[in-house]
Amino acid sequence: MSSHPPAPRKHVTIHELRRMKESGERIAMVTAYDATAARLVAVAGVDAVLVGDSLGMAVQGHESTLPVTLDQMVYHSAMVRRGLARGDGRAHLVTDMSFGSYQASADEAVKAAMRLVAEGGAEAVKLEGGAEFGEVIRRIVRAGVPVMGHIGLTPQSVHKMGGYVVQGKDSEKAQQILRDARALEAAGCYALVLECIPSELARIVTSQLRVPTIGIGAGPHCDGQVLVLNDLLGLDASFTPRFVKRFGEVGAAVQDAVGAYVGEVKARAFPDDAHSFHSSSVRLVPVERHAEAAEEEPPDAIGAPI
């Protein structure tokens, strides 16, 4: 038996993702919004991490992704980058471009993408939309920033789409999604997210593209899958879309743990001796002196209150 430790896993690049598609190896991607989550998912072995604008709903409590700002995406992306570095450093990091950061002009889009890379530590950016964003994608790619596309259900267009509904169910809309997929590949996207489209359509799109497809609510035929971390952990028992499989019941575990903590505090069972500090050299102020000091004028406060 060899005594040599196993070789460290290679960092996943855009080229490695293409190789995975070509070899038939499935790509596992999840979202993360902070350093702790990023470290945990990295150690768990994910291939890619998405700092999604879904943080607007999963973290900030909004009803949609629309209120999320570019500054917030930069902030969360930088946190995730630090967390991945504390994991195994292997996962590929993609960050969403927020609503309004790329729709107005290609110039603004390039500047926003460069911020996400330079300040947020992203290796690539993801933007939503079809062929109409082809020139924006070309400009960003020419600036040196890889772009992941996103078609099908695009949450930033929720009002235009009339809600969070499956896309491409009829022949005409399915053909448009296929045309958009080809156009985004031609514009320079290195991968595409396919969200909430029929499994049959996702299979056709995947088979006709050279770049990897990452599905969410798009069936088993994509080259990879992505889920929102909060959803797969079961943090919100009230949110159960059909395409989400809950791989844990972390929400219930959190409630149980915090409930146990509250109970022990109320019962004066925590902290106990094992969770307290001790010293044999502490000098106590006599009770009488302490009482006299209480009657004296209190000194000026030093430092900030807590």
From Swiss-Prot:
GO molecular-function terms, A-Z: 3-methyl-2-oxobutanoate hydroxymethyltransferase activity; magnesium ion binding
Q: Which CDD domains match?
A: KPHMT-like
Question: Pathway listed for it?
Answer: Cofactor biosynthesis; (R)-pantothenate biosynthesis; (R)-pantoate from 3-methyl-2-oxobutanoate: step 1/2
Q: In which organism is this protein found?
A: Anaeromyxobacter sp. (strain K)
Q: What family does this chain come from, according to its entry? A: Belongs to the PanB family.
Principal EC category: transferase
Query: Which sites bind Mg(2+)?
Result: 53, 96, 128
| Location of this chain's protein in the cell | Cytoplasm
Question: What is the taxonomic lineage of the source species?
Answer: Bacteria, Pseudomonadati, Myxococcota, Myxococcia, Myxococcales
Q: What is this protein called?
A: 3-methyl-2-oxobutanoate hydroxymethyltransferase
